C-alpha cells in the first residue's frame, strides 16, 4: 500500500513539474477554481449576502459553450442556488456531468455523477466522500486531477463537448469499485448495468423551476458509461438498501448502480461517459463520435488545443503574471454559456415541450441556457466580436425557440420558458448582433417575435402564467410606466415595477434600431397606436423618464395617479419596486439615452455630482449587473478621466486571483465578460448600438484575432498600476480625441494606440465633439 501511495504522489509531482515546462500554454494562466469560495472583494463585503456571496462558478473541464461541464462534486444535490462544487468543502463525492447555469442562483439538471472508491463499498454520496487537498488538485479548462485521500485513488478527467474520459489509478485494485448516480432530487430516474456491452446506462428527468416549478420539462438527461475491465460484482441501490446482482433500478431517492472491477495489479483503469438530451442512442453516438478510442492523453491534447485556440483569440503582453491570470481566467468563465444542446447528429428536444425532436440545420448548433438579464450586457457583445458565426447560431437558436413555442422567450433556461428575471433582453441580444453585422440568422422571423413581445400579451392566462410574453405589459402601455398598484403577480419575483419600466424602455429602443436598419414598413406588424412602428417604439424608449422623480433625480415608485412615493431617503435602500438593488443603482439604467437621463437629473452638473457620489459614498455595487455600465458614464459628461480611474479601481478591487475572487455571482459569465472588456480598454454601454465607450486599457499590448482574418491591436504605452490615465490616443496612426469608437473600427482591423500616464489629462476626450453620440437624435 505504501509503495502504491508513493507511486500516486510521484504521478502528482510529475504532472506539477509538467506545468512548469509548459508555461507558454495559456491554459496554465487559468485556475478554474476562482469564484468557488465566498466573495472576498470590497463591494461583496458591503452588499453581498445569501447567494450573492459566492461566484457560483465551477472548476469544470469543458469545450467552450459545450453541452456538459465535467466537474468534481462536493454537493450532492441539483437544488436551486447550490453549485456542485465549493472550495470550502473538504470532501469530493464524485465527478459530475453538470448542466449548472454557471455563476447563478439556479439549479443543475439532467446530471449524473460517478465516483471511484476502494476498500469497503460506500455508495451514498455523504458516506463515500473522500478527503482531498487543494494542493493536490490540478484544475485547468482541459484537465482536472485530484488525489482522493481516503482511497489513495489518483483521479483524472478530460473530455469534449458531450463526453469525457476518466483515468483512475487505484491503490487497492482488489477492491476497486465504481459508483454511478442519476442525480434526481425528485426521486425519479433510471439506471441499468449491461455486463455484455460493458456499459452503465440511465437517465435523469429534467424538471422546471420558476414558472412551472417542479413540472417535468418534457425531456431527460440520458447518460452512458463504458468500461474496459472485467467485473467481479455488480448491483444497484436505493438510498440505504443495496441490491447485489440486480441490473436495473428505477425511481426513488438516491438510486444508483455499482461495479467491482476484476483487477489485480497497480495501474490506471479508464472510464468513458457521454450524455444526451434526446435519448440513449444520442448519448451513444455522442460518445462514439467524440471519443471513439481509449486514449486519455489524446483526448486531453485535443481539448488543450481547443482551449489554446479560444484563449489565444486575445493575446496580451505584460510582465504582470497576476493580471494575465485574471484576464485569461475571466475569458475562460465567459466561455461556458449558452450551452450546446443538440447531439452530434443535430437532434435536440423541442423548446418548451420536449417533443418532437428537432434537427439543427446546416451543421450549426442549437444553444440553450441564456441567462439573458445578465449576459446581454457584455457576454453576448463579446461573442459578437470574437466568434460572430457562433453568435449568429446562438441568435438563430432564439429564433427557433420563438417558432417552436410561439413567443420569444424572456429568460430561456432548461429549454423552457421562464419569467425568472425582468426585461425582454433577447431583443437586446438579437438587436446587437444584427446592428453589428451578424447575418447568419433569420432577422425577419426574429423581428416578428420581437414585435409580438413588444405589442401583445398571451391570449390565454395559462400561456402568460407559463412565462410567455412581457410581465405587466398592459400597465406599461396604459400608463407609460408600471404603477405600484400592479404587483405583477404572475412573475416569479413580483413587483419590481420601476426596474421593469426602465428595462422595457431600453428594449423598445433596441427594437426600433433594428426596424430602422431593416427599413421595415409599418404594415410589417399591426400597430395598435396607429403610428409608425419606429416612432411608437422611440416614444416608448423615453418611458424611463416617467419613473425618474424630478424632485430627487432618482428612480422611484409611482402610483397610477401619477404621484411618486414621498420617502426620498429610500433612494439608497433596497426596495421591492427595484430589482436586486436600490434606486440609486437603477437610476443609471437608461443606456440608450444618457443625455436624456442627464436632463432628468437637472443637468450635467447634478448628473456628475450624483455619479461622483456613487463612488465616493461607496454606493457602487459591482456584484450585481445593474451597476456594470455606471463607471463608464463619466465619458458622456466629458470627464473620461474619472471613468479611467473608477474602472481601474474596480478591476483591482473586485477581481482577485483567488477562490473568493469575484464580487458576486458570475451570472453565466457576465461578471467575467465585464473584466475582459475593461482590461481591453472599452465597454458596450448600450448593446444595440455600434459604439464602445473607452475606459483604461490595462496591458501594454493586446491583440484581438478576428474570425475574418484581421487583427485589432490595442497599444497602451507605459500602462501599469500607476499609469492608468489616457494622455493621448491614435486610431490607425491618426490623432484620436473621441472617448468612444465603433464596432466597424474593430472588424476592419487596425490599431488603437494610447499614451498612458499617472495623472489625468482632463482635456483628452472631454470636448463636445469627443462625446458618444446621442442615440435619440
Model regions and ranges:
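Bacterial Sec-dependent N-terminal signal peptides
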Residues: 1-23
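Accessory carbohydrate-recognition regions in carbohydrate-active enzymes
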Residues: 22-380, 384-428, 434-502, 510-520, ...
Amino acid at each position: 500500500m505504501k509503495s502504491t501511495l508513493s507511486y500516486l504522489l510521484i504521478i502528482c509531482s510529475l504532472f506539477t513539474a509538467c506545468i512548469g515546462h509548459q508555461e507558454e500554454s495559456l491554459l496554465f494562466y487559468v485556475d478554474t477554481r476562482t469564484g468557488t469560495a465566498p466573495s472576498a472583494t470590497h463591494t461583496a463585503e458591503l452588499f453581498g449576502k445569501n447567494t450573492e456571496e459566492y461566484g457560483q462558478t465551477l472548476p469544470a473541464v469543458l469545450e467552450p459553450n459545450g453541452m456538459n461541464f465535467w466537474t468534481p462534486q462536493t454537493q450532492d444535490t441539483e437544488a436551486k442556488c447550490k453549485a456542485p462544487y465549493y472550495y470550502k468543502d473538504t470532501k469530493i463525492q464524485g465527478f459530475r456531468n453538470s448542466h449548472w447555469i454557471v455563476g447563478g442562483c439556479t439549479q443543475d439538471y439532467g446530471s449524473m455523477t460517478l465516483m471511484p472508491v476502494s476498500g469497503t463499498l460506500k455508495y451514498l454520496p455523504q458516506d463515500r466522500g473522500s478527503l482531498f487537498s487543494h494542493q493536490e488538485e490540478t484544475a485547468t479548462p482541459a484537465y482536472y486531477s485530484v488525489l482522493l485521500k481516503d482511497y489513495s485513488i489518483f483521479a483524472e478527467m478530460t473530455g469534449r463537448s458531450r463526453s469525457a474520459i476518466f483515468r483512475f489509478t487505484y491503490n487497492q485494485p482488489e477492491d476497486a469499485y465504481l459508483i454511478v448516480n442519476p442525480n434526481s432530487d425528485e426521486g425519479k430516474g433510471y439506471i441499468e448495468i449491461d455486463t455484455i456491452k460493458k456499459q452503465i446506462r440511465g437517465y435523469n428527468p429534467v424538471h422546471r423551476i420558476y414558472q412551472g416549478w417542479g413540472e417535468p420539462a418534457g425531456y431527460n438527461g440520458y447518460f452512458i458509461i463504458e468500461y474496459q475491465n472485467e467485473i467481479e460484482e455488480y448491483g444497484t441501490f436505493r438510498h440505504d438498501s443495496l441490491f447485489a446482482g440486480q441490473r436495473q433500478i428505477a425511481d426513488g431517492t438516491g438510486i444508483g448502480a455499482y461495479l467491482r472491477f476484476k483487477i489485480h495489479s497497480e495501474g490506471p483503469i479508464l472510464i468513458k461517459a457521454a450524455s444526451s438530451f434526446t435519448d440513449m442512442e444520442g448519448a451513444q453516438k455522442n460518445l462514439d463520435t467524440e471519443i471513439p478510442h481509449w486514449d486519455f492523453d489524446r483526448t486531453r491534447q485535443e481539448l488543450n488545443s481547443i482551449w489554446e485556440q479560444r484563449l489565444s483569440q486575445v493575446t496580451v503582453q505584460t510582465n504582470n503574471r497576476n493580471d494575465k491570470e485574471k484576464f485569461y481566467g475571466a475569458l475562460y468563465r465567459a466561455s461556458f454559456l449558452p450551452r450546446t444542446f443538440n447531439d452530434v447528429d443535430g437532434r435536440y428536444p423541442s423548446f418548451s415541450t420536449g417533443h418532437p425532436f428537432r434537427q439543427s440545420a446546416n451543421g450549426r448548433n442549437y444553444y440553450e441556457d441564456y441567462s439573458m438579464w445578465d449576459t446581454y450586457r457584455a457576454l453576448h457583445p463579446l461573442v459578437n466580436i470574437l466568434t460572430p458565426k457562433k453568435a449568429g447560431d446562438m441568435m438563430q437558436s432564439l429564433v427557433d425557440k420563438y417558432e417552436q413555442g410561439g413567443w420569444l422567450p424572456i429568460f430561456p433556461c432548461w429549454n423552457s420558458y421562464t419569467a425568472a428575471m425582468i426585461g425582454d433582453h433577447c431583443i437586446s441580444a438579437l438587436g446587437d448582433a444584427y446592428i453589428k453585422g451578424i447575418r447568419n440568422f433569420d432577422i425577419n422571423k426574429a423581428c416578428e417575435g420581437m414585435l409580438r413581445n413588444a405589442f401583445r400579451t398571451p391570449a390565454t392566462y395559462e400561456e402568460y402564467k407559463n412565462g410567455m410574453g412581457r410581465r405587466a405589459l398592459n400597465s406599461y402601455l396604459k400608463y407609460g410606466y408600471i404603477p405600484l398598484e400592479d404587483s405583477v403577480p404572475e412573475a416569479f419575483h413580483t413587483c419590481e415595477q420601476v426596474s421593469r419600466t426602465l428595462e422595457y424602455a431600453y428594449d423598445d429602443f433596441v427594437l426600433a434600431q433594428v426596424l430602422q436598419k431593416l427599413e421595415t414598413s409599418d404594415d410589417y406588424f399591426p400597430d395598435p397606436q396607429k403610428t409608425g412602428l419606429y416612432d411608437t417604439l422611440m416614444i416608448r424608449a423615453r418611458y424611463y423618464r416617467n419613473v425618474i422623480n424630478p424632485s430627487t433625480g432618482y428612480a422611484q415608485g409611482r402610483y397610477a395617479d401619477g404621484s411618486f412615493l414621498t420617502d426620498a431617503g429610500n433612494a439608497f435602500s433596497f426596495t421591492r419596486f427595484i430589482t436586486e438593488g436600490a434606486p440609486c443603482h437603477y437610476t443609471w439604467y437608461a443606456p440608450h439615452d444618457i443625455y436624456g437621463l442627464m436632463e432628468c437629473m437637472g443637468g450635467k452638473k447634478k448628473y456628475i455630482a450624483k455619479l461622483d457620489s456613487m463612488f465616493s459614498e461607496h454606493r457602487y455595487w459591482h456584484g450585481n449587473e445593474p451597476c456594470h455600465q455606471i463607471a463608464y458614464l463619466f465619458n458622456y459628461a466629458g470627464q473620461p478621466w474619472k471613468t479611467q480611474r473608477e474602472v481601474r479601481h474596480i478591476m483591482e478591487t473586485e477581481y482577485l486571483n483567488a477562490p473568493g475572487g469575484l464580487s458576486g455571482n458570475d451570472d453565466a459569465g457576465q461578471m467575467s465578460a465585464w473584466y475582459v472588456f475593461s482590461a481591453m480598454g472599452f465597454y458596450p454601454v448600450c448593446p444595440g448600438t455600434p459604439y464602445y465607450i473607452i475606459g483604461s486599457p490595462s496591458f501594454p499590448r493586446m491583440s484581438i484575432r478576428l474570425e475574418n482574418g484581421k487583427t485589432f491591436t490595442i497599444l497602451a504605452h507605459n500602462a501599469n498600476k500607476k499609469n492608468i490615465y489616457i494622455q493621448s490616443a491614435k486610431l490607425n496612426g491618426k490623432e484620436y480625441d473621441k472617448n468612444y469608437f465603433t464596432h466597424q473600427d474593430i472588424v476592419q482591423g487596425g490599431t488603437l494606440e494610447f499614451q498612458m500616464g499617472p495623472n489625468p489629462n482632463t482635456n483628452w476626450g472631454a470636448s463636445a465633439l469627443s462625446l458618444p453620440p446621442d442615440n435619440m437624435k
